Amino acid sequence: HFSKEGYKVIGTSRGNFNLGELIGDDGAFSAQLDLMSKESIKNLFADLKSEDLLPSVLVNNAGITKDQLFLRMKDEDWDDVIETNLNGLFRVTKAFIKPMVKNKFGRVINISSVAGLMGNSGQVNYSSSKSAMVGFSRSLAKELGSRNITSNVVAPGFIETDMTTFLNDDEKVEVSKNIPMKRFGTVQDVAKCIMFLASDEANYITGQTISVDGGLFMY
């Protein structure tokens, strides 16, 4: 969506990948990034700055799960999820927000989850990290609104991605019974919401959490 609207898209991953091939845009920029490493983030910032590619729109969508019932959850299960989902969010945003402040324009869009809003059995670590993202985004919105920087959250529900492939067809039907729209969402549903928040049409929307979940969680 961003590429089709004329944005220069920058994608990151721990491993090697070709973003241009994935989205059909030869001009897309691919980079390796380890959210656990301040040095890795620093190097990416330097690379993008040298290419005059520092982003005005930052989409934080990295996330991992290590599901386990709380009574059986190991310390490392908690630490790893918080480190990636929350501390990684802090590090990346801290690094890339300063140019936005200088330019007096920016969009920070953080991808949370319905689990962070309503909780989910077996996901105390994941739900906590995604819920904290909401508080992070609201506080950032209050601090940086005067600099024309918006900070919002998109909270997807059950979406047809690799993270839901563990469900078989019968399980998907059962889960869908609790969704008013009776189906899983698509990646495009989420992308369109992100695109809207990045657009000029959303220039007066900040500190908000938008659920893309077919009505699973209403508040």
Regions of interest found by a model, annotated:
Residues 118, 195, 206-219:
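Short C-terminal tail/terminal secondary-structure segment
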Residues 73, 119-127, 139, 167:
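Active-site loop-to-helix junction immediately N-terminal to the catalytic Tyr of the SDR YXXXK motif
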Residues 98, 142-146, 203:
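Alpha-helical segment proximal to the catalytic Tyr-Lys
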Residues 113:
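Residue(s) in the substrate-gating loop at a strand-loop-helix junction
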Residues 93, 129, 137:
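Active-site helix of classical SDR
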Residues 1-10:
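Canonical Rossmann dinucleotide-binding motif of NAD(H)/NADP(H)-dependent dehydrogenases/reductases
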Residues 69-70, 74-82, 164, 175:
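Substrate-binding pocket helix/loop in short-chain dehydrogenase/reductase
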